């Protein structure tokens, strides 16, 4: 009886520690990143205003079944692979169309957006419908809002 109680206590302590650690992580696997389109709202610490044409706003969408992400940089469509495990998020090589972007500011935004995606090492959900991408040092490189 005493051995059974000790064994139960020994096994329950690590489980409790893992549960408590997950509470502060900002990760809710019940609310996956797959599904909604994610519109870019901050690039680094710079706000990104939505454009007149929602289809041309910088955005991402993740497809769990294929392990692929797709979206728009603002001028060009893009796609690539991704893997995620807990809070880790790794985006593969990004392929993008090569359409000319008439607005130099939009072109610069797209280039910086693609660079931020390539620097991504993890993500954090920041409440309902808001996701931050972080680089390897934990610095926020981009923030998105869900568009359903």
What spans do the regions from the language model cover?
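Lipid interaction determinants
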Residues: 2, 6-11, 18-148
